[in-house]
């Protein structure tokens, strides 16, 4: 067989296609599928209960899994990741660093079915073994990285690898990212304080709907607007300033990806770690409010070592895997399965964050104690003069099922973002929450927890300004930005009396504030007055 021979393209069927949240339920309802998966994966069904067999399949299937994405045509940016296991032939194909064949997913419109195509990668003679490449494996990779990537099929002990973390060089901060082009000439930034009609261009419907302050009015002409409140990224500040002959206000900062991208956020936050705390061998978070986080793209060997060292010490090993730059709960997985984590890293660039296994829970009527997290709105008016504010009113997000360290595929148990799905959504005003929280978790005072949250937020933004772009957030005279910080509360039981500490989950740029507007119709009046008119009094903000 020759690689360019069109006669040697073979179709491989998929034995099972599913989404991760439905896998266990499908197996529980289909005995024939269970038997077939046991046969494909060489799992013995004797001397094991039905539940044990299914759990073995769910663990072992990560040596066989592959995936593809189906885009949601009704909701931009939303998708479904489908996982599949090939038929008996496809699942028997071994991996090799010198593969003889290539394999790719193939969607056939005729029957609306997904298959895999197999075709020779090199000249192959009769009797040679059909092999495919290890995912992500390249000859240029280090031996440690190769061992980590091959782990699902060739398990090895990597615990001797140094799992301490260091800050990558500037190339990493620039890799795959657009750098902003800033004006070189000195342009004037017009003051808006005495401007009777402030022209605002926005592509956010909520801003147009809820902004009632008569000093602001909407315009469709971007080049004539005083303020650009944008959903899309702006990279060429220079050309826009030149076309206007003056500077402008815009709802973003140069290089703010160091806060938004989860891999960079972890790097930035580690700058807040005190020297006497910076000992990763204690297996403590550093800083305490940042979950231990590894980039699975560049730190996979270190992560595997850290995982195996925790395992040897009988420490819990539950992790949450998140894409670098997605939000709204998309493509996020909770697991304690090392093979699964490594295979997830093939799907897209991801981080593995230590899962908060002892969260502060909240009673939900007719349900029980559920997981919750908090969304705080943070306003950055200047990074150079460090003008930072937090909106006093936060909002709550609750899981729908009682929390426990099991059933990690159960979205309603382990996740709280329900407003982009068909799951029930519980809503509560923050002032009502505080009263009930102090009642449930007495003697803990919300004011003490709030002070910790505010200090954490300030530390995050200080850390982001410690380096020049692209390793730190940049400065532009007209930059004003709003960020949504997702925070969870965690028990610290290392004291005589348990303490409650905040833990950062992620930072979102220009967050969805529809719920904030529904709760507080004056929300955008407050936000824009603080950012662009320097008004603080009566605007429900605290300066940090």
Task: For each feature predicted by the language model, list its residue ranges.
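Conserved beta-strand elements of beta-rich interaction domains across eukaryotes
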Residues: 2-6, 15-19, 23-25, 32, ...
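Acidic, Ser/Thr-rich intrinsically disordered and amphipathic helical segments
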Residues: 92, 126-129, 144, 202, ...
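Surface-exposed beta-strand-to-loop junctions
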Residues: 108, 190-191, 239-249, 284-288, ...
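Conserved N-proximal alpha/beta basic substrate-recognition cap immediately N-terminal to
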Residues: 201-318, 325-327, 334-337, 343
């Amino acid at each position: 067989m020759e690689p360019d021979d069109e006669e040697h393209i073979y179709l491989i069927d998929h034995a099972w296609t599913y989404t991760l949240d439905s896998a266990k339920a499908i197996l529980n309802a289909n005995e024939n599928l269970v038997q077939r998966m046991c046969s494909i994966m060489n799992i013995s069904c004797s001397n094991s209960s039905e539940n044990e067999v299914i759990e073995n399949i769910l663990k072992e299937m990560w040596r066989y899994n592959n995936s593809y994405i189906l885009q949601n045509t009704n909701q931009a940016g939303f998708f479904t990741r489908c996982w599949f296991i090939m038929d008996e032939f496809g699942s028997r194909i071994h991996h090799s660093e010198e593969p003889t064949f290539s394999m790719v997913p193939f969607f056939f419109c005729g029957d609306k079915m997904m298959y895999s195509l197999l075709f020779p990668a090199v000249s192959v003679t009769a009797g040679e073994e059909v092999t495919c490449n290890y995912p992500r494996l390249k000859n240029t990779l280090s031996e440690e990285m190769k061992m980590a990537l091959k782990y699902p099929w060739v398990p090895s002990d990597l615990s001797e690898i140094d799992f301490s973390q260091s800050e990558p060089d500037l190339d990493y901060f620039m890799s795959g990212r657009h750098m902003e082009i800033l004006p070189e000439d000195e342009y004037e930034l017009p003051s808006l304080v005495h401007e009777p009609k402030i022209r605002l261009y926005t592509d956010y419907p909520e801003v147009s709907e809820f902004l009632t302050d008569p000093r602001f009015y909407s315009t469709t002409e971007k080049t004539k607007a005083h303020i650009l409140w944008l959903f899309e990224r702006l990279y060429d500040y220079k050309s826009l300033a030149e076309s206007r002959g003056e500077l402008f206000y815009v709802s973003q900062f140069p290089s703010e990806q160091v806060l938004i991208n989860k891999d960079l956020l972890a790097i930035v936050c580690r700058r807040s770690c005190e020297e006497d705390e910076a000992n990763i061998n204690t297996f403590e978070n550093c800083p305490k409010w940042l979950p231990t986080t590894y980039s699975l793209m560049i730190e996979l060997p270190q992560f595997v070592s850290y995982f195996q060292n925790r395992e040897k010490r009988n420490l819990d090993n539950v992790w949450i895997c998140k894409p670098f730059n997605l939000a709204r709960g998309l493509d996020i997985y909770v697991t304690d399965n090392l093979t699964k984590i490594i295979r997830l890293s093939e799907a897209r660039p991801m981080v593995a964050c230590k899962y908060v296994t002892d969260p502060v829970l909240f009673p939900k009527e007719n349900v029980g104690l559920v997981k919750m997290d908090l969304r705080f709105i943070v306003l950055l008016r200047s990074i150079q003069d460090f003008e930072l504010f937090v909106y006093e009113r936060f909002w709550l997000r609750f899981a729908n099922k009682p929390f426990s360290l099991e059933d990690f595929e159960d979205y309603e148990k382990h996740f709280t973002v329900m407003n982009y799905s068909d799951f029930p959504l519980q809503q509560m005003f923050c002032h009502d929450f505080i009263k009930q929280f102090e009642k449930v978790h007495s003697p803990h005072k919300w004011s003490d927890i709030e002070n910790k949250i505010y200090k954490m937020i300030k530390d995050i933004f200080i850390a982001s300004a410690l380096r020049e772009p692209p390793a730190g957030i940049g400065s532009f005279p007209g930059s004003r930005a709003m960020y949504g910080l997702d925070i969870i509360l965690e028990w610290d039981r290392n004291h005589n009396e348990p303490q409650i500490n905040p833990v950062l989950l992620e930072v979102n740029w220009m967050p969805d504030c529809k719920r904030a507007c529904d709760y507080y119709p004056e929300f955008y009046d407050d936000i824009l007055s603080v950012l662009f008119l320097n008004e603080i009094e009566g605007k429900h903000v605290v300066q940090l």
